[in-house]
């Protein structure tokens, strides 16, 4: 194994989340709690007391939220007062949702790292799974085409084990827009998981003929409206299908969730699905040059349903690889089994929340503290293939 990969595995002995928790207690390391919702105060305090952590700082959103008294050893500060805290907590704990994760960059200059809220058991499960599948993970790592991919891949694995948000390595370019892996002018592109049509329009502006697939009926309507209200550029043809992509044609249940709608046998709604091989034949597509997939854990199913298309045309692909823990190796291995001549890269992105996820009031708060609208998280990991 290469030295960097070996070093990462070796470091996990002390850096994995469960061991870090033990070290925090043993060393009485100063820790903080970021309470964007003060109603969770007692929950936080109970957690810290039960875990025997050294809680030295409770940080609330604004001065008006300082409505409770500090307990022994605690400092209560508003976010804008955090610079005055001494000693600074080494780690900040947060609870629930994406909103508190946005403040990673605010705490970072003060030397305070942030745990993202997946919990001890989740991180331990990831660690156990990764250790079980080290040969597969190492194989993927070694097959990545550039050093940046390897660094991003190791960082992604590492952060999932440490549960430290700062350990991720986020790419600078817009998601799906890695140079060399984009649809070109005249390409036939598949947008699997079109959501609101934004990526469909982006690909059309590259000059591609785009076929977008969205199983959620409400999202499908939003796609149509967005495309009607936008110049997709170059007079390029865009088709939006109210279909999900899968390994076969049929009807299945799904659980609605805006950007997170996913197939679920216990789901409350139903949608029609189709495999890409059947769709391409039925629509007489002369070829497929590009595929983007973000379909909430159904990526491997879809790839099985596109096996003939991928084998025949070797399209460039951008495949989301974070919905299932095993995506880091199963997606890679399957694509490699279809075409051994694929080149692979890996990137991890912040969530673009410019017009998504947060409301105007929350965005105003981000601006006040000099933060972007891009949310750091464990989501948005992408395998690129060409």
Predicted regions and their residues:
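Phosphate/nucleotide-binding beta-alpha loop and adjacent structural elements of enzyme active sites
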Residues: 1-57, 61-386
């Amino acid at each position: 194994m290469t030295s960097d990969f070996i070093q990462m595995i070796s470091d996990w002995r002390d850096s994995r989340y469960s061991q870090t928790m033990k070290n925090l207690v043993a060393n009485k390391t100063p820790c903080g709690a970021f309470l964007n919702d003060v109603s969770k105060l007692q929950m936080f305090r109970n957690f810290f007391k039960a875990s025997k952590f050294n809680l030295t700082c409770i940080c609330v959103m604004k001065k008006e939220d300082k409505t409770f008294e500090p307990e022994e050893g605690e400092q209560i500060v508003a976010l804008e007062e955090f610079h005055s805290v001494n000693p600074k907590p080494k780690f900040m704990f947060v609870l629930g949702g994406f909103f508190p994760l946005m403040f990673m960059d605010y705490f970072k200059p003060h030397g305070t790292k942030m745990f993202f809220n997946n919990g001890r058991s989740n991180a331990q499960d990831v660690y156990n799974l990764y250790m079980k599948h080290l040969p597969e993970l190492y194989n993927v790592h070694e097959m990545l085409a550039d050093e940046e991919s390897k660094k991003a891949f190791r960082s992604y694995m590492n952060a999932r084990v440490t549960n430290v948000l700062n350990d991720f390595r986020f790419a600078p370019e817009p998601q799906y827009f890695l140079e060399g892996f984009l649809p070109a002018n005249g390409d036939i592109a598949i947008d699997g998981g079109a959501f609101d049509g934004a990526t469909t329009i982006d690909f059309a502006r590259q000059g591609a003929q785009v076929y977008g697939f969205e199983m959620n009926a409400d999202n499908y309507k939003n796609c149509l409206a967005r495309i009607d209200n936008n110049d997709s550029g170059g007079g390029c043809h865009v088709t939006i299908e109210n279909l999900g992509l899968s390994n076969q044609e049929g009807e299945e249940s799904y659980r609605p969730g805006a950007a997170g709608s996913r197939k679920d046998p216990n789901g409350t709604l139903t949608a029609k699905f189709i495999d890409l091989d059947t769709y391409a034949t039925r629509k007489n597509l002369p070829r497929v040059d590009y595929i983007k997939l973000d379909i909430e854990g159904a990526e491997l199913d879809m790839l099985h349903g596109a096996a003939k298309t991928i084998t025949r045309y070797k399209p460039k692909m951008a495949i989301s690889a974070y919905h299932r823990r095993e995506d880091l190796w199963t997606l890679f291995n399957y694509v490699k089994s279809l075409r051994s001549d694929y080149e692979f890269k890996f990137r991890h992105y912040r969530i673009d929340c410019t017009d998504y996820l947060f409301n105007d009031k929350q965005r105003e708060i981000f601006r006040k503290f000099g933060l972007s609208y891009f949310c750091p998280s464990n989501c948005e990991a992408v395998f690129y293939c060409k």
